[in-house]
Amino acid sequence: MNGTVTVLDKGAVRIHSYMSPADTFHTTTQLIETPARVIAVDAQLLPAYADEAIAYAKGLGKPIDRLIVTHAHPDHYNGAARFGVPVHALAQVTEQIIARGDSRLPTGEVIPLSEFTPSVAVIPGTEVIDGVTFVFEAVSGGEAADELLIKLPEQGVLIAQDLVYNDVHLYLGNNDITGWQQAVDALAAESGYDTVLAGHGLPTGPEVYADVRRYLTDARELLGDDGDAYKKAIVDKYPAHVGPFIIDIANRSLFPAGN
């Protein structure tokens, strides 16, 4: 396995957090193991890494019940077809995925839209799955236009995905630092959650919110009108962070004339 898996025992639930290697900026697929099934959250940029997460999940000896895609960025849905189960997403996220169209891998290979279009709408609210309470909330603004936040209140777990990165450079291509700061503030105001699952990086705890806030504050200060200068400045500020290529991807949106 090229990726790594971190296992968290939460009583009736076990969390298996698959994290891709640094070449795809430590993107995560969360495998939520309930008594009789597995709920998968997000599907990787590279299908090969999705295959690793799926092979691990199958080793648990329980069927994968569904795949939930949290937002409309390809590093979270390109591998969706590999799971072979219904793909769930917020209606607005599905619309955004459709608007993006076919996905092109770094190799040039094209993944047709039909392979990853969600087919089941996630309705915000509470759903009990295999005896486990899941709370689904829609969050607007920040890292993406819309994101799904998943809470497991009985286990004290927040599946924040790309609302939170852990020691990985932040993708700012949505050009909404203020919205992201507000989303993180809302997460930080939650009580009773000691485990936070990040969309990039290892599982963490509430202490990650201060880290994300600090990075966003620094990014706002360092962002000017030159993408290369911003990248150098933020990498110098956070030399240990993984995934500086994320900055290049974001800069194409932030500075389209110069990239």
Regions found by a protein language model. Give the residues of each.
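Short Gly/Pro-enriched turn/cap motifs at secondary-structure boundaries
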Residues: 20-22, 117-119, 138-141
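Loop/turn elements at helix/coil->beta-strand transitions in domains of secreted/extracellular proteins
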Residues: 36-37, 62-65, 86, 132-133, ...
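Metallo-beta-lactamase
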Residues: 45-47, 133-214, 218
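Active-site HxH/HxHxD metal-binding segment of metal-dependent hydrolases
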Residues: 55-126
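Conserved beta-strand hairpin/beta-sheet module of binuclear metal-dependent hydrolase folds
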Residues: 5-55, 149-162
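Short catalytic-loop micro-motif centered on adjacent basic/acidic residues
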Residues: 39-42, 66-68, 135-136
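Divalent metal-coordination and catalytic microenvironments
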Residues: 32, 42, 57, 71, ...
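Accessory terminal helices/loops
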Residues: 2, 189-191, 202-259
